[in-house]
Design a protein with these regions (language model features):
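Alpha-helical cap/lid subdomain in secreted, periplasmic
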Residues: 1-189
Length: 189
């Protein structure tokens, strides 16, 4: 039973293809089949745990191409294109709408300029398709450059780290931005 809960989710729901649903799914407690319905389950559970607790919602961050360092076959494109007909930004909008409806504080990381897609990594190191020589591509230049997890080097060397270290997960610098926003709200509670 905590005094403050933070709810920071959405990117895995989007990538996994969970249907966004509609705000009516949230209002009518529509169940776990949609993102909106699932969010209602979470909010209701937190309120049952402690009706007096403060709840802070956090939207997902934007993301560029993710590549897992321990298994490069685990990789995914960024939020710059649809996944199963949905954009990650729609999930951020849903969280903002829920926060407004419930009068909850929302940390909108998706629309935080310091966490924009151009600032997530300095570059992605890939083979130039014409020459086969590795080259550092800044966003959005790397979007259509192929990456082969079987033969290519890891595309995010230490020097490429910016707000994320792998295109998705926050680096120390990225967590600093998130922490600043969270502390600002916590001080006002």
């Amino acid at each position: 039973k905590a005094d403050v809960y933070t709810v920071f989710l959405g990117t895995n729901d989007w990538w996994g293809g969970r249907p966004l649903g509609t705000f009516a799914d949230y209002e009518n407690n529509g169940g776990y089949q949609t993102f909106y319905g699932s969010f209602r389950i979470i909010i209701d559970k937190l309120r049952r745990l402690n009706p007096d607790a403060k709840i802070i919602l956090m939207t997902p961050m934007q993301r560029v191409d993710f590549v897992y360092i321990a298994n490069m076959k685990n990789n995914a494109y960024g939020s710059y294109k649809e996944k199963k007909g949905q954009m990650l930004g729609q999930f951020a909008e849903a969280i903002n709408a829920i926060g407004k409806h419930e009068k909850l504080k929302v940390i909108d990381l998706y629309n935080t300029k310091r966490l924009s897609v151009k600032k997530l990594v300095k570059y992605k190191r890939l083979k130039d398709p014409q020459t086969g020589v590795y080259k550092n591509y800044a966003y959005p230049d790397f979007i259509d450059v192929p990456f082969n997890p079987e033969t290519d080097e890891y595309p995010y060397p230490v020097e490429s780290i910016a707000m994320t270290y792998d295109g998705l997960h926050p680096s120390d610098e990225g967590y600093e931005v998130i922490t600043e926003k969270l502390v600002k709200i916590l001080k006002k509670l």
